[in-house]
Structures are given as structure tokens and as C-alpha cells.
Amino acid sequence: MNINIRSNPMRKWFIWAIVLIGCLPINKALAQQSGDAERNTLRIMSYNIRNGRGMDEVTDLGRIAEAIRKVAPDVVAVQEVDSVTGRSGGIDVLRTLGERTLMFPTYAPAIDFDGGKYGVGMLSKEKPVSYRYIALPGREEERVLLWVEFERYIFCCTHLSLTPEDRMLSLPILRREAASAHKPLFIAGDWNATAHSPFITEISKDFLLLSNPKQATFPASTPDSCLDYIAGYVKNGQPFTRLSAWVPEEAVASDHRPVVTEVRLKAKPEEIFYAAPYLQNPTEGGITVMWQTHVPTYSWVEYGTDTLNLKKARTIVDGQVICNGLHNKIRLTDLRPGQTYYYRVCSREIMLYQAYKKEFGETAVSPFYTFTLPSASQKDFTALIFNDLHKHIPTLDALYGQVRDIPYDFVVFNGDCIDDPANEKEALYLSLIHI
């Protein structure tokens, strides 16, 4: 029973960890899958807070913080923010909001004002990698663009001029900065431009509006105009998909309502696979190929007796391909005993899966592996059996060192290799350790 993958030692594909997924309680497994499926999803918010002064002329940062907490964004672009001014009683407004929302504050002053500064800011769940700010035109008031880099994306915040000419003069600067980005870039803020204005028409040539311009944001009590926007840079391709957009019904805390959008960032091909594929159930002229991905995918197996003439296998139930999940299980059938087969697995990310709209990302393709089903005359085989590892890597290292050079047909990881896994990530724990 020769079931081997291409020069891939046993300890580089810990199938025992993955097999334990089946032992998880269903609700825990589903909850964990949902969490992993959303790992690339980003909730973006933009809010002109008028320094916390509401439609009732009461300044209350608690209301602003509560409006943000209700949305639970990953990142917020904030406009009209005081920093230790007399008007704000010497308070660092953005830092105060950061403390109340448990988010990192990043500030960009636009002007000196009342003994302190006045400008824009950003709140983020993730600590920024770097930030800078760039001056923008504004004849009635100086303007600024706040550029903040995170691990996977760049987010910019600005409050554009009331003057149409200055807004148009800002466009080349916005385009220049966006073109220099080496990650997906988003920009948000109060742009002081209505949905059908020349500025929105022009910026839409390079940026995709992610918020809904048909939903009014100003004035907050009875909004009749959209002045607040979130957009993504798409001139060099679209590395994300918009999932949803809305305007929360916050009518009092500020004179603007916030805008919110959710996007999913595309995974790079090398980020799609969780670990190498593994084989199960080599019976009745067939074998099952299984593997996991970090993101929802449409997946298939390509296989054949050589690497040039390949068949494609998928899992089909009632005429429909099973997809849009993280766990892939595909059965190869009509195989000949004693014949060596080559195979590789392919997974294409599903960015959006709706009844009438589907969007796809990149495709990951594994190297070729091989397996040979046992022939009818084969009676002998070699198996490696491990017990009671208790997630102890040094023990696995030592045991593997004793059998490193033994050609084996399959591996059995018996009881207590992982102690009572609480969730899927724990069950998959060792499959990521490439010792």
C-alpha cells in the first residue's frame, strides 16, 4: 500500500491534527470556520464628529464613542477633531475617543486653533505600521491628508475644502499618493461634494466608491445630501471586493451621520492553502484527497498517470459543486491498483457568493504529489503508529528521528496526540509547524 506524497516527509503534513476536526462539536467547528472565513474582511467607517458637538449643540464625546462602538469597525476616519484646544477644555479629543473605543488613535493637524490643533484623525483596532500627513489645498482653511499604513492595507483620511476649485486641485495629490501605495489603499472622509458633483465624477475614474452615495449623510437630523464617502483605489486593479455599505441612523451625536462599508481583501495565492493535502480511504479503486484553506474557495483536484494529461475532479452533490468553504474533500475514482498517479490540488478564492453575483480572487495551485494504490497481490505494508504525544514537539522530534529513513506506506496517530481540542485552530495546530 504505497501512498506517498512527493518527497514530503511525514512530519511536514500532520494529518493527525487535521483528522481531529471531525471530533469537534459541530457548533464549535462552524463558529471557527466562520471566523477564519472572515479573516480578510475589513469594516471601514468614516465620521465627521464636529468635535463631539451634536445637533442639540451639546458636546458629548460619549455619544460619538457609542456610535462608533455600535458599528464595531476595524478602522475609522474621523474629521473635525480638536487637540488640546481651549474649545475642547484642553482635552486630546482623539485620544479620549481611542480610550473609550479601545482603538489606537492617529492624528493629523491641519491648522493651529485656540491654543491647540484642529484636524483629522484615525482610530484603528490594529496598531499602525507607519503614518504621515500631506498638505492639501484650502483657501478658506488649510486641509490635510492623513496616510496610515497597516500590515495588509493603507487607509487615508481627509476633510476636503468647501471650495470646488480646491477640491479639484486636491485630486492630483490624492492620485499621486494612491499610485505610490504598495498595498490596497482606501480613502475616506467628508469631501464636501455632493454625489453628482464634478469632483465625485472625476475621482471615480481612479477610485471605486464603496459607500453608497445614494444614502444622505447631512444634516444628521434630516439628511438630504451625501457629503461623506469611502473609496478604494482601483486604477491598477481591484485587490478587494465590497460586501456591504450603509449609513447608521445616528441623528444627534454630530451634524453628519457616519458611513460604513465592509470589504474583503484578496488573499495572495501563497496565502490560500492552510497546509499540504493529505490522503484518506484508499479503497475500492479510489482515494480521497483532503486539504484546508484560509479563505472560502472553489476547489478541484487535477490527476493522471503523468503530469501532462490530467483529469479534473470535484465534489458534486445533486448536480451542484460543493464550494465556498474552508474544508475540501474530493474523491478520485476508477483508479487502477498498482498504478502510480500524480495529483495536485487547486483552490480559487471566492470573494463574494450571492444568488446573482459571484466574484473570485486568485488561484492557488499545489506542487504535484504521487500515490500508488495497493495491488491485489500486495500483502505487506509498513505503517508508523504514534501515541500519547500530547502536543509535545520535542517528543515528536525524537520519535521521528528514529524512523526518518524508514520507507512507510501510511501513518496512524492514535489517541492523545492532541489533548481535547477546544476548536478547529487547536485541532490544526501542528499542521502549521514545518519542523
Region spans (language model):
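Metal-dependent phosphoester-hydrolase catalytic domains
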Residues: 32-34, 133-134, 166-168, 176-186, ...
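Active-site beta-strand/loop signature of hydrolases that rely on acidic residues for catalysis
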Residues: 42-49, 64-88, 155-158, 174-201, ...
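Structured beta-strand-rich core segments of catalytic domains in phosphoester-bond hydrolases
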Residues: 56-57, 81-154, 246-247, 322
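Short beta-strand segments enriched for Tyr within beta-sheet-rich domains
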Residues: 291, 301, 338-347
